[in-house]
């Protein structure tokens, strides 16, 4: 299985769809943090929430783009922020990340117009595909959003017809019976 990582700006998705992120809803914020910590512990994954969240990930996303979004680069950035719980969102924190990663020209890389354009285009393409959250896996124009969809995605990889049953097709056109007033 070839997994291609594509950095996007989550805030761009939220703005487009008119949604709040889970950390912007007070009751959901704590629940989400605790679940992530519990899940990581259960699966032996190093995990520590950074000093503040939500935070602006723009520099880290641009750095990933500038370094071709390899699994190694994304792993390094992800581990720094979420494995070690370090700050990469302040100027000092980002500088420390680039020192530890031995990327002396990071500020020049992330200032590049082409890097900024790629991140913007990635986000616009995600919106065009109908992506509304992260992580999302896109397989043959079929989207699987979130960790809880991993088993469904794996099932789909084994048997793409899992989503073509009569009931699955009916669900794609299910009407609404009520709408909230906003």
PLM segments and residue spans:
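C-terminal cap of thioredoxin/glutaredoxin-like
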Residues: 1-2, 69-72, 76-182
